[in-house]
């Protein structure tokens, strides 16, 4: 890999990281607002960021895509979609990928993704919790 390629790659990673900082801070602020306005009875902040982030990634993918009205370079798309939306949501990439499957006529794959992904996430959370709980019970340091 040449030095120019390394610089280009490093610049892309820096853009994605900067977008992630913006998205992550925005998500945190939504969470703080939710706690003070709505309390802790329901995860409104997560619902809000996932819905709004899914809207933003879908909108930006269309408006800045090859047939879109807005010219955006690959780096700009990565900054917004991978960085900001990825840092802001826990759901936008999954939503976009599932929508793309539906839009391109792969309804069965989209349905499988809708069923398998959330269940896998829940199982993974459960397993992670189980492993950590058992580790916490071990004696010693």
Curated annotation (Swiss-Prot):
Na(+) is not transported, but it plays an essential structural role and its presence is essential for fluoride channel function. Na(+) binds at residues 86, 89. InterPro entries: FluC. Its main location: membrane. Keywords: Cell inner membrane, Cell membrane, Ion channel, Ion transport, Membrane, Metal-binding, Sodium, Transmembrane, Transmembrane helix, Transport. GO terms for molecular function: fluoride channel activity; metal ion binding. GO terms for biological process: cellular detoxification of fluoride. It catalyses: fluoride(in) = fluoride(out). It is a multi-pass membrane protein. It comes from the Bacteria. The keyword Transport applies. The chain crosses the membrane at residues 12-32, 44-64, 79-99, 107-127. Belongs to the fluoride channel Fluc/FEX (TC 1.A.43) family. This is Fluoride-specific ion channel FluC 1. The lineage of its organism: Bacteria, Pseudomonadati, Pseudomonadota, Alphaproteobacteria, Hyphomicrobiales. The gene is fluC1.
């Amino acid at each position: 890999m040449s030095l120019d390629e390394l610089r280009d790659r490093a610049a892309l990673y820096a853009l994605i990281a900067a977008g992630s900082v913006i998205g992550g801070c925005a998500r945190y602020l939504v969470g703080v607002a939710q706690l003070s306005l709505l309390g802790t009875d329901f995860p409104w902040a997560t619902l809000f960021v996932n819905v709004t982030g899914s809207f933003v990634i879908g909108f930006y993918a269309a408006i800045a895509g090859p047939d879109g009205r807005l010219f955006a370079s690959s780096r700009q798309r990565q900054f917004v979609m991978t960085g900001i939306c990825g840092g802001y949501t826990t759901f936008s990439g999954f939503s976009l990928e599932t929508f793309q499957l539906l839009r391109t006529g792969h309804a069965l794959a989209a349905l499988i993704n809708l069923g398998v992904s959330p269940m896998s996430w829940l199982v993974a959370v459960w397993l992670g919790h189980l492993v950590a709980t058992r580790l916490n019970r071990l004696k010693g340091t």
